[in-house]
Amino acid sequence: MSFVIAAPEVIAAAATDLASLGSSISAANAAAAANTTALIAAGADEVSTAIAALFGAHGQAYQALSAQAQAFHAQFVQALTSGGGAYAAAEAAAVSPLLDPINEFFLANTGRPLIGNGANGAPGTGANGGDGGWLIGNGGAGGSGAAGVNGGAGGNGGAGGLIGNGGAGGAGGVASSGIGGSGGAGGNAMLFGAGGAGGAGGGVVALTGGAGGAGGAGGNAGLLFGAAGVGGAGGFTNGSALGGAGGAGGAGGLFATGGVGGSGGAGSSGGAGGAGGAGGLFGAGGTGGHGGFADSSFGGVGGAGGAGGLFGAGGEGGSGGHSLVAGGDGGAGGNAGMLALGAAGGAGGIGGDGGTLTAGGIGGAGGAGGNAGLLFGSGGSGGAGGFGFADGGQGGPGGNAGTVFGSGGAGGNGGVGQGFAGGIGGAGGTPGLIGNGGNGGNGGASAVTGGNGGIGGTGVLIGNGGNGGSGGIGAGKAGVGGVSGLLLGLDGFNAPASTSPLHTLQQNVLNVVNEPFQTLTGRPLIGNGANGTPGTGADGGAGGWLFGNGANGTPGTGAAGGAGGWLFGNGGNGGHGATNTAATATGGAGGAGGILFGTGGNGGTGGIATGAGGIGGAGGAGGVSLLIGSGGTGGNGGNSIGVAGIGGAGGRGGDAGLLFGAAGTGGHGAAGGVPAGVGGAGGNGGLFANGGAGGAGGFNAAGGNGGNGGLFGTGGTGGAGTNFGAGGNGGNGGLFGAGGTGGAAGSGGSGITTGGGGHGGNAGLLSLGASGGAGGSGGASSLAGGAGGTGGNGALLFGFGGAGGAGGHGGAALTSIQQGGAGGAGGNGGLLFGSAGAGGAGGSGANALGAGTGGTGGDGGHAGVFGNGGDGGCRRVWRRYRRQRWCRRQRRADRQRRQRRQRRQSRGHARCRRHRRAAARRERTQRLAIAGRPATTRGVEGISCSPQMMP
């Protein structure tokens, strides 16, 4: 047996296959029994009857033999299964005596083992998770906080070893009337591994007062490979309590993207989304968290996008939370790294929708676009303003470009104001010495007063001024265009008349040069395209062949934005769809960016459906960038304000440039109508770019899926579900990239059920050390919390599994039935190298009438040949701890029995040696006596005796 080699996993798989085969054979035998054991005679004669009886007897004999074979098959499968378990137990028993002395030495001197996972903190104690082994080991999960008047803080996750993931932070304790406990911070990874997810903040049971706990910060990624941890979601509340703020995402490693910020908790005022984590040296900043839903006040502000690493792009700002009164503002996009070449600042987050048909409401303002790096790169696009039943939200300003080369970011479109005024378009960003000013955003439409267009950015040295945004339907005024650069360039649309004779001469000469190109090809050589004239439904004009921005599409008709200049230039924003009584009116698609450099335009907002049963228009798709540049943000879905209407879906984000640039974020699903619109999918990344984040869903709707990463890019983050909606799935990584994080589900507030978290995306097949995306957290609810999403699988050979999402908290309903959501299963590690993801913690049950039931913890994933299996979630932790403790006592007892047996054997051997020496002395004495020589008296066994006294 010393040369026997067995793989328990292979034996278990073979047993499963054999069991399935046996079931199939049994089903086939049962189906054939009726037709073979009781044959009907072909005729009434004796011969036919005898033949039928003969064949029936054969069939019965076959069934009897089949039953015996089935019993043997079941015994064989049972023996195979038990044999695999015996081999696994033998392997564990053989390794433990060798490893225990080494680990005991390191534990005594450093407080952590050399190899092994850290212990999980016990639930309800807020204890920190233990650190993993110095060489190989995952950090333990922090224990959840204790419930009370004020919830206790969750424990921090333990740090991972050189190879291993950080532990997840514990969830904050539920408060009966005070402040929910803050979630614990996720543990940091060391070299190869993913940072742990931050714990969710604790909720509040009382219907008045209090505040939800803040989510914990995500852990930092490993220095070389691994994903940064996701920030924990803020605690949800009921009644007049405030939602908790989401935790910040962890920092990325050398090549990793920063972690996604946690979503804000739902409440009377929504909690702010957590900030995205900073990118690693070559990594992009993380996406900011989605603001929390508010039922009686302001929606939560979206989290700011994380700053890019030294050579990375900025992260996208989080979307503002929806509200029944006033939507939250979108988060600002993160700035690109100082030395980033061609990387853009992050796009600003979309403002949240606000209000109801009867009470009115205000849409949230879009977030500002992030700035580019120090020398090269374009500014990020501003976020679109949110829809308001009274006033639309203002569009966010575009970010500024690098000082030497790059175009300013486009301003976000103003939000639609149904009852009073549309939102003002955002201002375009400032370009570099060479580059075009950003276009101003279009004003939002309104039945009363349309919003004014945004101001175009001004050129610096060589480049066109940005076009002023078109005014919204309802007598909105066009924005002022930007002035061109000092040496070369045309003024933007609606630019003020110049008083400089030199500038006037320059403009006239360029107009003469552009005339034949405009006549023959429909676009100038140098200059921006012309905005569509209101009332014509015309698409925006394309930018110049050399450089120029595409124009914005005509508002109110869903016209597409114009393409950017053929070489350099940003695409124009699509116009919003028309207001109608029944039929859908899709928003216009954003224009494509230039071939070399340029950002795609943002998609237009879908039209509003006012009639009964009307369907809001889908948001327009964001424009794509061709070589270097970012894709545009998808347009928001149109609202349906009539009876039994359906909200429009958000538009898909534009794809990033082939080489560099960020993919666009999907648009928001519409808030109005039942069902509401789902969020748009994020755009796909380019060669080195990450996929775009999915858009947030409308009220009770699911978030959009994250886009897939490029060849070396990370998958995009799934969009957050709103209220009861499920989170979107994270995008898959490129061939050499990591998987995206699943979106968080919306919190149910005072509702009954809630959605589950999105599943994490899988890492690319050939990525080295990349992690699967973490599953999204399940939403909190008054009764049953939503299930956490499953973590994505690591790369095929070398990679780490993503952590499962935490289950949502069960809230405070007037019933004793409380059930926390189940934690998501951890992802599998690579086949050869990599630790598996930890299962998500089950959500806590809380109740005004008594203690609820905690959710089941998720299963840990399977590790590779070199790596650790993932820890189970918190619900299973205590049983597992007891089992491990019993195993330690058993091993200690076995060791003591072996030592006693060895001592007995040693004493027996000593007695045998004494007897042999005594026999040898007797034989010598006898020989001497025969020879007539005197005998020597010796002591035998301590007794002085003569030869005559010998037996």
UniProtKB/Swiss-Prot annotation:
- Report biased composition (Basic residues) as residue ranges: 887-919
Q: Where is this region: Disordered?
A: 887-951
Q: Which UniProt keywords apply?
A: Cell outer membrane, Cell wall, Membrane, Repeat, Secreted, Virulence
GO cellular component terms given for this protein? cell outer membrane; cell surface; extracellular region
Which residue ranges traverse the bilayer? none
The record's listing under InterPro entries reads: PE-PGRS_N
Q: Kindly list the places in or outside the cell where this protein is found, as annotated in its UniProt entry.
A: Cell outer membrane; Secreted; Secreted, Cell wall; Cell surface
The chain positions of domain PE read 4-94
Spell out the disulfide connections: none
Family according to the record: Belongs to the mycobacterial PE family. PGRS subfamily.
Tell me, in a sentence or two, what this protein's role is: The arginine-rich C-terminal region protrudes from the mycobacterial membrane and mediates M.tuberculosis entry into host epithelial cells. May serve as a bridge between mycobacteria and host cells by interacting with specific host phospholipids and extracting them from host cells, for their direct integration or as a source of phosphate, during phases of TB pathogenesis when M.tuberculosis is short of phosphate supply.
| Protein's name according to its UniProt entry | PE-PGRS family protein PE_PGRS3
Which organism is the protein's source?
Answer: Mycobacterium tuberculosis (strain CDC 1551 / Oshkosh)
